[in-house]
């Protein structure tokens, strides 16, 4: 029997294995939701995230015809409250099931994206397991956090781009930026990748597939340089049809969602869902290195210059990453997300899920072995986080004044994040998402998706 026929025969069993993973993951999440209901009723420490209570209260207000922003600390899109209105008349755990379903959808999208790039099934399975069986990710949805919905939309946008569905990608991108502001950082790399040598009218973009060689051999310096984006080429086709269409549709959807929300909820929506996230200063302890400065000077208003300076590290790193890696789109937005969280003015644990959903998509192109280098990075990152949490526990639950050691722990956490990020970049095999149509002769050699 030929190898092709053997691979064809193996496909049903491979699909069954992946489906079994999804079924087991679903049962695990259902169990955690049911267990969470029991823990909330019988134990002092609640399983349910405090944010879920805020979401549910806002949804209840919306269901009764009032503004969800009457609920203090609700600072999200009205769409979230709308999605959770069944909490009021169906069951209070409706939202948890919705978020957990989105969590499973993320796993399915990860598998789909990797298969589209011809990653072997075994590697696909391991990559999906990094998401589905990560204790942090399978608890965040079951505890009632909405981030899995955002992750699912972002992966769907990537999948739409890979399939050449620019209209869908633009629509969902405008929607996800309205739903959660932070994906706005992906606008520039997406626009840059919509090159006329990649997206041509009437043609599906050709993907650059995974191959065995790139899993074993690190990229040379010359190869890395070829992946730096050619600025001159960009300027020549800056206003291409695809870029203009994507910008107009995504911008139109974003503005339309905001206009409808503003029509119903006015300045409350504008301030709580949008402006608040741009000017947020949190005096409570969090992972950010800025928290101590904000805590010491919270009584006074920060000047515009001080607020701008706090954004400069983020802007600088973002532009540098986009310039270097935009053609390797998935890797670029992963790096952007990690850097955005690392240098943000406020960092909470739920933000980590923003890049957890992208991590499985870059693993097949990484040369970092779990033993020892990968293990070292994991220990360093978790160790720095645990060290911070110990000081946070002393402050929060014991009432001990440990603000200075806690700030030092934040500095160490920043250093750990930076070290791990640099190692990931160094051990990554740079691979553009799309092949470029250099000429009519070379286009005949482009391997298109089956």
Swiss-Prot record:
InterPro entries, alphabetized: PIG-M
Pathway: Glycolipid biosynthesis; glycosylphosphatidylinositol-anchor biosynthesis
Keywords attached to this entry: Endoplasmic reticulum, Glycosyltransferase, GPI-anchor biosynthesis, Membrane, Transferase, Transmembrane, Transmembrane helix
UniProt cross-references to Pfam families, sorted A to Z: Mannosyl_trans
Free-text disruption phenotype from the record: Plants display cell walls with decreased crystalline cellulose, increased pectins and irregular and ectopic deposition of pectins, xyloglucans and callose.
The protein's enzyme class: transferase
GO MF annotations in UniProt: alpha-1,4-mannosyltransferase activity; glycolipid mannosyltransferase activity
Annotated coiled-coil segments of the chain: none
Localization: Endoplasmic reticulum membrane
Source taxon at top rank: Eukaryota
Cytoplasmic topological intervals: 1-20, 115-121, 170-173, 265-314, 367-374, 423-450
EC nos: 2.4.1.-
Transmembrane spans: 21-41, 94-114, 122-142, 149-169, 174-194, 244-264, 315-335, 346-366, 375-395, 402-422
UniProt membrane topology term: Multi-pass membrane protein
Lumenal domain ranges by topology: 42-93, 143-148, 195-243, 336-345, 396-401
Keyword Membrane carried by entry: yes
Annotated GO biological process: GPI anchor biosynthetic process
GO cellular component: endoplasmic reticulum membrane
Function recorded in the entry: Mannosyltransferase involved in glycosylphosphatidylinositol-anchor biosynthesis. Transfers the first alpha-1,4-mannose to GlcN-acyl-PI during GPI precursor assembly.
Family to which this protein belongs: Belongs to the PIGM family.
Protein name (record): GPI mannosyltransferase 1
The species this protein was found in: Arabidopsis thaliana
Gene this chain is encoded by: PIGM
